[in-house]
């Protein structure tokens, strides 16, 4: 486990794309940085939930694979040597003279001039597929870390939201067959995404639930669906993707005395929270007109870091100049 630094200028809570860019930008502004995250590797939801999916709304990239975006952000930040405290929680927050003290588990703490919360949706737990409990981890998954593992397989995707359709779209080129099953007649996914998957000829079975998964020690062989009117349908399946969404909460951050709004943190135009020296950016930050995008998070990270630079050193300039003039 990485040694915990005794003191840094900025502690970033959350190692998703926004947190990684904040780590880079804080280094660019001359700050020492530590990044704490409960997950075992950087990337946040992108790494944990959709490393193989293509992302289409990051500036400068017509498309970019999730894991490739994370790798690029880690490389960008590496030039300033941020300290990664992975597999740890940011627990108790307390004020000390000239800064903040954050407990990071294992009876260890980090003293920081400021804290930037980039925790995304917080700690997330996938919603279970009841009929799949006995198969979880051996044929039934919530997220796909490697698409190639499903090459030549019959895959059943369960869900009706964007995530389910994203997985169907990603699996289509590699799997032998992909079938999407949803328990309702209407989908929550974006209409354009539904049309794209339907246009590929992927069967979309609605008003259906997974009744049973059958197989052997090698894994699933087939999925039995319960349809309307007490009908049944059996699909071949060597893999099932349960894309049913997830539950999330902010964990210990909820006890930090910040002004919260539906599991997000209220911020002002400088990205400062209701507590001095504590800032927030990315999906976890809330303000009027907020749009939750990775691209938005990058801008919020820069806004937060520049204002933190001035908060820590009143003689610093809010605007650091254009990076293109500093080569």
UniProtKB/Swiss-Prot annotation:
Could you tell me which InterPro entries the record lists for this protein?
FAD/NAD-bd_sf, FAD/NAD-binding_dom, Fd--NADP_Rdtase_type_2, Ferredoxin-NADP_redctase_2
Q: Which HAMAP family match?
A: FENR2
Spell out the reaction equation it catalyses: 2 reduced [2Fe-2S]-[ferredoxin] + NADP(+) + H(+) = 2 oxidized [2Fe-2S]-[ferredoxin] + NADPH
Q: What residues bind FAD, as annotated?
A: 18, 37, 45, 50, 90, 124, 283, 324
Keyword annotations for this protein? FAD, Flavoprotein, NADP, Oxidoreductase
Please give the subunit comment from the record.
Answer: Homodimer.
Q: Which cofactor does it need?
A: FAD
Per the record, the domain of life is Bacteria
Q: Which GO terms describe its molecular function?
A: ferredoxin-NADP+ reductase activity; flavin adenine dinucleotide binding; NADP binding
Task: Write down what this protein is called.
Answer: Ferredoxin--NADP reductase
Organism field? Saccharopolyspora erythraea (strain ATCC 11635 / DSM 40517 / JCM 4748 / NBRC 13426 / NCIMB 8594 / NRRL 2338)
EC id: 1.18.1.2
Which EC class heads this enzyme's classification?
Answer: oxidoreductase
Q: What does the UniProt cofactor note say?
A: Binds 1 FAD per subunit.
What's the family?
Answer: Belongs to the ferredoxin--NADP reductase type 2 family.
């Amino acid at each position: 486990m990485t040694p915990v630094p005794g003191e840094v200028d900025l502690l970033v809570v959350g190692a998703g794309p926004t947190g990684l860019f904040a780590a880079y930008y804080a280094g660019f502004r001359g700050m020492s940085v530590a990044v704490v995250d409960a997950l075992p590797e950087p990337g946040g939801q992108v790494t944990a939930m959709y490393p193989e999916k293509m992302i289409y709304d990051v500036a400068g990239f017509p498309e970019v694979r999730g894991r490739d975006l994370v790798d690029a952000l880690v490389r960008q930040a590496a030039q300033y040597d941020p300290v990664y405290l992975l597999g740890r929680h940011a627990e108790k927050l307390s004020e000390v003279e000239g800064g903040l003290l954050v407990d990071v588990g294992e009876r260890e703490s980090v003293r920081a001039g400021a804290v930037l919360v980039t925790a995304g949706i917080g700690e997330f737990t996938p919603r279970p597929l009841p009929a799949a409990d006995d198969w979880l981890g051996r044929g039934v998954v919530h997220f796909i870390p490697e698409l190639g593992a499903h090459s030549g397989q019959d895959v059943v995707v369960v869900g009706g939201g964007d995530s389910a359709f994203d997985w169907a779209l990603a699996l289509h080129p590699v799997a032998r067959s992909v079938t999407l099953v949803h328990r309702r007649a209407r989908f929550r996914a974006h209409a354009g995404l539904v049309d794209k998957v339907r246009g590929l000829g992927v069967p979309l079975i609605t008003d259906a639930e997974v009744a049973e998964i059958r197989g052997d020690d090698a894994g699933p062989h087939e999925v039995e669906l319960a349809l309307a009117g007490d009908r049944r349908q059996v699909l071949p399946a060597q893999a099932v993707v349960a894309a049913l969404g997830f539950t999330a909460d902010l964990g210990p951050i909820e006890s930090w005395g910040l002004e919260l709004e539906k599991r997000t943190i209220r911020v002002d135009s400088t990205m400062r929270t209701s507590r001095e020296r504590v800032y927030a950016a990315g999906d976890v930050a809330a303000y009027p007109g907020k749009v939750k995008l990775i691209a938005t998070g990058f801008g919020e990270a820069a806004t937060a870091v520049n204002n933190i630079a001035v908060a820590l050193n009143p003689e610093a300039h809010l605007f650091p100049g254009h990076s293109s003039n500093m080569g």
